[in-house]
Amino acid sequence: KGGNIIALAQELYCSDYVPYLLQKIEEQTPYIRPVSFSFGKQSFSEPSFQQLDIVLLASPALLTYLQERGINTALAKRECKEARFTHNGKRYFAIAFPNISGGYEIRNRYFKGCIAPKEISHIRQSGKPRSACYVFEGFIDYLSFLTLRLENCPQSPDFDRQDYIVLNSVANVSKALYPLGSYERIHCFFDNDRAGMEAIQQIRK
């Protein structure tokens, strides 16, 4: 299932009433603005990480950053860790989102990168195998979805009704094809750009 904004709104607001959904979409749209950060010209490739520690997500600065992005921090603490490392003699910390191969996507206010190996993240629910999987490009998208779902359906967010895959880059879409083959329904929440549309086409094949 591709990137249909109405379908996404139905999931987020727990409603099938289209006029209500359109109103909620309109209310949210004016607040969307692109934000970009730079961190000099430093490249955070895997060999540059030294004294790496993965701990519980607790840094006030990181939690404040997530709050500014509209992310529920309790959900973030459940889904993410905190990476502390040294780079070029300086100590840094970042939000760390685990993947299926033991690596992490890392991000803070000033940079984003990964701790190799770079892979997809697959969040499977316990118990009976789920028939549906929701797929996201990045973990901030995933956390945003969970946050909105909790805000709009606080009594019954149904987080465990489906599994989730986070690509951690649209370049990883081929790595997601095999695990996605076991699901009856796949819902993709990608950016409405060329890369996102190409990723959807690969999944549909």
Q: Where in the sequence are the language-model features?
A:
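Non-catalytic accessory segments of DNA primases and related replication-initiation nucleases
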Residues: 1-65
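Terminal peptide-recognition signature
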Residues: 9, 66, 137, 145, ...
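Serine endopeptidase catalytic core focused on the charge-relay Asp
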Residues: 63-75
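Short, basic/aromatic recognition patches
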Residues: 72-90
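Phosphate-handling DNA/RNA-contact segment within nucleic-acid enzymes
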Residues: 85-179
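Acidic beta-strand-to-loop metal/phosphate-binding motif
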Residues: 135, 184-195
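Acidic, metal-coordinating catalytic cores used for nucleic-acid/nucleotide bond scission
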Residues: 169-173, 190-201
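Short, aromatic/basic amphipathic alpha-helical patches
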Residues: 177-179, 198-205
